[in-house]
Swiss-Prot record:
This is Holo-[acyl-carrier-protein] synthase. One of its GO terms (biological process) is fatty acid biosynthetic process. Transfers the 4'-phosphopantetheine moiety from coenzyme A to a Ser of acyl-carrier-protein. Its EC number is 2.7.8.7. GO terms for molecular function: holo-[acyl-carrier-protein] synthase activity; magnesium ion binding. Its main location: cytoplasm. Belongs to the P-Pant transferase superfamily. AcpS family. Keywords: Cytoplasm, Fatty acid biosynthesis, Fatty acid metabolism, Lipid biosynthesis, Lipid metabolism, Magnesium, Metal-binding, Transferase. Its cofactor is Mg(2+).
Length: 126
């Protein structure tokens, strides 16, 4: 295995709270419909959104292309396996791009404290 890409992002939860106070445009841009449902059910919506935003930004950095050229935050969704480990679910469009790049695996770590959320993504190839 070799590292194909690495990305890290940190988000200040207060900035997400301010954005939520102005409306839900960030929610619609960042979260998939399933993630929006999860956010509504969460104890702290701002922290939930901050963690997802950090994760998706970190993934876009690991991709080495940011969010552009046909890929958006809507093409990636954070899911959890049976042990609670965060993992990626990519739409068909994103999954095809990942396959074309020769990316064979991904690792996602998300952490948060009262004021910050941080995520790191490692993409690997055989």
């Amino acid at each position: 295995m070799a590292i194909w890409g690495l990305g890290t992002d940190i988000v200040e939860v207060a900035r997400i709270e301010q954005s939520l106070a102005r409306g839900n445009s960030l929610v619609k841009r960042v979260l998939t419909p399933k993630e929006q449902e999860e956010m509504t059910a969460s104890v702290d919506e701002a922290a939930f959104l901050a963690k997802r935003f950090a994760a998706k930004e970190a993934c876009s950095k690991a991709f080495g292309r940011g969010i552009s050229a046909g890929l958006s935050f809507q093409h990636m969704q954070v899911v959890h396996n049976e042990y609670g480990k965060p993992e990626w679910h990519f739409t068909e469009t994103a999954a095809q791009w990942v396959k074309e790049q020769g990316i064979s695996g991904s690792h996602l770590s998300i952490s948060d404290e009262k004021h910050y959320a941080v995520a790191t993504v490692i993409l690997e190839t055989d």
